[in-house]
Structures are given as C-alpha cells and as structure tokens.
Regions:
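Transmembrane catalytic cores of multi-pass membrane glycosyltransferases
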Residues: 28-87, 93, 151, 202-304, ...
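Aromatic-anchored segments of alpha-helical transmembrane domains
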Residues: 21, 133-140, 194-199, 236-246, ...
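Membrane-interfacial loop-to-transmembrane alpha-helix junctions, especially the N-terminal start
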Residues: 9-10, 120-131, 182-186, 225-233, ...
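Hydrophobic core segments of transmembrane alpha-helices in multi-pass, intramembrane catalytic enzymes
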Residues: 103, 156-168, 207-215
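Start-transfer (signal-anchor) and selected internal transmembrane alpha helices
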Residues: 1-22
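Membrane-interface alpha helices of multi-pass inner-membrane proteins
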Residues: 185-202
Length: 333
C-alpha cells in the first residue's frame, strides 16, 4: 500500500478515535454512584470516613470480599475492587477514565504483540489496524453505561476483559523473548494476573482458560511441543477459579435459582445465545469496518508462517470458544 496514503489514513483513524473518546471522558464529572456501588462500598466508606487511612480501606475491602465470598458469590478479586469504588473518595469521575484507559491500552498492547512481535508488520500498519480495532471495541459496545459509566457493573466485565488481553499478550511474549530475566518477570506477572482474573466474573473466568487450553492443544498437535509454561499458568488459573466456583456463597446464591438446566442443555443454550448475540451485534457499521481491514488481514494471512491444515476445524473451535463465554450464565443463572 502507498505509504503516504496509509499514513494519512492512520492519522485520520487516530483523530477519529480521540474525538470519539472525548465525550465518554467528559461525562465523568456528571456520574454518580448507583445500586451495588453503595452495597459493596459501604464498609470501605465507613473505614475512610473514620480513619482516612488507605491501609484501613484496603483491609475493609478485603474483609468485605471475604464476607461476600461466604454469603453470596465467590468472585473474590472482583468483590475486592467493587468495595474500593472511586466514589468513596469523591472521585467517581475517574470511572470512565480507568475503564476506557484499560480497554484502549490492553487492545493496543495485544495488537502490538500479535502484529509487530509475532507477524512483523510495519509500525504504520500496526498503528492503523490496531486503531481500527480499538475504535470498534470502544464504539460498538452493547451499552456505554454498562461498559464505562457504572463502576460496579463495568469494572466486573470491561476491566477483566482488559486484564485478559494483557495476560494474553504476556503469554505470547513469553514464547517470543530470548531474555531469561524477561521470562521470569513474565511468569510472575502472568501467574498474578491468572489468580486475579480467575477471581472475577465467570464469563471471563471460564472463557480465558478455555482459550488457554486450546492453545496448549494446538502446540501439542501442530508444533509437537509440550508448552510447560502455558500448562503451569493454566494450572494456577484453574486452582484459583476452583476457589471462586466452590465458594460457600455461590451455593447460597444458587439456591435462589428455581429453574437450572443440566450441563448438556446449558451447552446448547450457550451456542444459541452466542448465535443470537452475533446476529444482534453485527450491523452495517461493523461490516464496513471489517471490509476496510480485509486487504490488511488477507495480506497478513498470506505472509504468515502459520499454517492451518484444517481451517474449517479452527473456525469451528473458534466459535465454540466464543460460545464458552455464554455457558456460565446459561448454566447457573
């Protein structure tokens, strides 16, 4: 592609992204706490007003997380963050900045890891493609309120999605770097992120290890390698996720559900929901954006050193992995 044209398109895409973000951030000062923001934040608010000690607030947030773990839900790290909602400190305007910033940064990071480090495209091409993906991720969310403005609900999903992208970047980078020190740091950070993400919502909680498991299988089948690093991270993740799933509070909450499908029924329900969601989510604008990306993606696929002997099988697996994100709500809610 003509480099001058690509540069102009990249600058235009970045300008559109910035302009589209400004209104989201500008709404921040007009936001206020709502619903579960008060429920989870009350103990920390009491600690803050009584002591103005950050340490006391962190302790109160942890105590609240463990209380919820025993009485309502096992998502230990999410409940900890919910208890520390910014409104306690009079900073609720930070909510869209935190959530939007995490989403933008994590998407660019994963894009850099895949496009630059793995596929070796130019910086300009990376900037253009990644910016379009960031623009789509931000502007095509199902609900701006639930994605960026309500801390309790948005943090539960948007932030944990962003953390998952960071973790994916680290897992890929581990296999690309030659530095022993970098591998050690990546291992420690990846393990910490795995434990933290596993304590979040069950949608991300189940979807992320499913993708990780298939990455391990792919390396076994296609590369004839045993990915001990990925296996170790998956084991850490699975242990932490089990701690969340088998929380006493989950049994209490599940007792309030009167009609629960079996695993097989939930599996097909998840597939149905994924198809329904895709049908609702893909419109003319989404199609247009992907059409713009087709020349780049086609060239990347052609130049890639990765070979897929059974492309339709990979497409099917990708769809099933996508459906896995709908399984927790189909089975337990």
């Amino acid at each position: 592609m003509n480099q001058k044209l690509l540069k102009s398109q990249t600058i235009l895409a970045i300008c559109i992204l910035i302009l589209s973000i400004i209104p989201i951030v500008a709404i921040g000062p007009y936001l206020h706490q709502f619903a579960d923001d008060y429920v989870f934040g009350a103990p920390v608010y009491k600690a803050w007003t009584a002591t103005h000690s950050l340490g006391a607030c962190i302790q109160a947030a942890w105590d609240e997380s463990m209380h919820i773990y025993q009485t309502w839900q096992g998502t230990y790290s999410a409940c900890f963050l919910m208890a520390l909602q910014p409104g306690i400190f009079g900073k609720y305007w930070l909510v869209p900045i935190i959530l939007l910033g995490g989403l933008v940064l994590s998407t660019y990071t994963l894009g850099y890891t895949v496009l630059r480090r793995l596929l070796h495209i130019s910086k300009l091409e990376y900037a253009f493609v990644s910016t379009l993906f960031v623009l789509m991720t931000v502007q095509f969310v199902w609900s701006f309120y639930d994605a960026f403005f309500w801390y309790n609900g948005a943090m539960y999903y948007t932030l944990y999605y962003s953390l998952s992208l960071f973790l994916a970047s680290l897992l890929i980078e581990f296999h690309l770097t030659k530095s022993i020190m970098a591998k050690i740091i990546i291992t420690l950070v990846s393990a910490a992120l795995a434990i933290f993400i596993a304590g979040g919502n069950f949608v991300t909680g189940l979807g992320m290890p499913a993708i990780l498991f298939m990455a391990i299988v792919w390396m076994w089948v296609e590369r004839k390698k045993t990915p001990f690093f990925l296996i170790s991270i998956l084991m850490i993740y699975a242990s932490a996720f089990a701690f969340s799933v088998f929380a006493p509070g989950n049994a209490v909450r599940q007792a309030t559900v009167t009609d629960q499908p079996n695993v097989v029924a939930a599996f097909f329900m998840a597939i149905g929901k994924s198809v329904e969601f895709l049908a609702d989510a893909i419109g003319i604008m989404e199609v247009l954006m992907f059409t713009i990306l087709i020349p780049f993606l086609a060239r990347l696929a052609k130049a890639s050193r990765f070979k897929f002997s059974h492309p339709w099988l990979y497409l099917l697996i990708s769809f099933l992995l996508y459906s896995a994100f709908f399984f927790p709500n189909s089975y337990a809610m």
